[in-house]
């Protein structure tokens, strides 16, 4: 039966598609790089996302961020990206964490539950390690 991931399954195989569907990916920073990563992962069939960012879409994001449109300016990036992911794959689970990753809140994230972690943080002093 054809579904939205049929072409990807032809390329990767059923076992790989099951792994994607059952994987949980944390994306720290959903602006420029993180936005495109989320888009690609959603279109590839990843099942669960944790989106971490405390920034809002602003006018200066329009030239480079996939979530930035005139309609999304002023909205929190994690909420806009959640909506976009669910528009692409309504079966995905999307957990939003409206905060920045900082040393003070590092223990708030269940790193042992993530299959993959994307570090797309734009603050050079703070990176996921």
Indicate where each model-derived feature is located.
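N-terminal charged helix/coil linker that caps or initiates catalytic domains
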Residues: 1-26
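Hydrophobic/small residue at the entry helix of a nucleotide-binding pocket
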Residues: 33
